[in-house]
């Protein structure tokens, strides 16, 4: 089995932990990101999704587990945020990413999806498409991109849904894609549902690594209960 085939096999039917702290939060340091990554692996995660060069370098020093690397940018002339530039591809590979993920949505962009894919292939890394719909995913699949993520489903519109897009997982899987289900998988039951729907692997982020979000969910539920109690009187 080749190294790339072995890497694909490691992820199959597994959990990928996205260790991306809230920007500027108390957890937003490379050392803490690396610690979160190691804790996730100790809990059974088979891979990691890490943003930023310094974070990837820190995680790579701590583990040889598969890393999906991304760089997020806020561009003045494009809504594309995830790994938009060719130099991002080179930097991610040099930092230690095994898989390079990039936005493949049909939006105005500084570099074409095909050019990003070719540059990532040239580094020897595997590739992942962050798609928003079936058209994005199929285009990426036909280009030869190794993994198709549902990462951006619901995030290219004004209102973000509360539930994950299991229908998109099924559509892509039936088309022969290696689907990495991602986006709003906030419970073990939803992660299992993604595998049942045909996902190759499932990425979970906020529900594992963003303490602010998790605490917010609990606080909201408690407040809702308090409101319901008050309306009873």
From Swiss-Prot:
Involved pathway(s): Amino-sugar metabolism; N-acetylneuraminate degradation; D-fructose 6-phosphate from N-acetylneuraminate: step 3/5
EC number(s) per entry: 5.1.3.9
Chain ranges passing through the membrane: none
GO BP, sorted A to Z: carbohydrate metabolic process; N-acetylmannosamine catabolic process; N-acetylneuraminate catabolic process
InterPro entries: Aldolase_TIM (IPR013785), NanE (IPR007260), RibuloseP-bd_barrel (IPR011060)
GO CC terms: cytosol
CDD domains per UniProt: NanE
Entry-linked Pfam families: NanE
Keyword Amino-acid biosynthesis attached: no
Gene Ontology terms for molecular function: N-acylglucosamine-6-phosphate 2-epimerase activity
Catalytic activity: an N-acyl-D-glucosamine 6-phosphate = an N-acyl-D-mannosamine 6-phosphate
UniProt xrefs under Gene3D superfamilies: Aldolase class I (3.20.20.70)
Record keywords: Carbohydrate metabolism, Isomerase
UniProt keyword Isomerase present: yes
Family the entry assigns: Belongs to the NanE family.
Function statement: Converts N-acetylmannosamine-6-phosphate (ManNAc-6-P) to N-acetylglucosamine-6-phosphate (GlcNAc-6-P).
Record-given protein name: Putative N-acetylmannosamine-6-phosphate 2-epimerase
Organism: Yersinia pestis
């Amino acid at each position: 089995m080749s190294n790339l085939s072995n890497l694909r096999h490691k992820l199959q039917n597994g959990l990928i932990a996205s260790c991306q702290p809230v920007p500027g939060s108390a957890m937003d340091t490379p050392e803490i990101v690396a610690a979160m990554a190691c804790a996730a692996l100790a809990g059974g995660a088979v891979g990691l999704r890490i943003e930023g060069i310094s974070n990837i370098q820190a995680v790579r020093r701590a583990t040889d587990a598969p890393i999906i690397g991304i760089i997020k940018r806020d561009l003045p002339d494009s809504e594309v945020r995830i790994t938009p530039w060719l130099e991002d591809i080179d930097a991610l590979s040099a930092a230690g990413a095994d898989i390079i993920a990039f936005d493949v949505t049909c939006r105005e962009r500084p570099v074409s999806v095909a050019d990003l894919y070719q540059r990532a292939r040239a580094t020897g890394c595997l590739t992942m498409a962050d798609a928003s719909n079936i058209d994005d995913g199929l285009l990426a699949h036909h280009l030869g991109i190794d993994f198709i993520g549902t990462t951006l489903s619901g995030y290219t519109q004004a209102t973000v849904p509360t539930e994950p897009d299991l229908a998109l997982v099924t559509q892509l899987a039936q088309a022969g894609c290696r689907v990495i289900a991602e986006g709003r998988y906030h419970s073990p039951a939803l992660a299992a549902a993604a595998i049942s729907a045909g996902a190759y692997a499932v990425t979970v982020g906020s529900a594992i690594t963003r303490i602010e979000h998790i605490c917010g969910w609990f606080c909201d539920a408690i407040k809702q209960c308090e409101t319901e109690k008050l309306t009873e009187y």
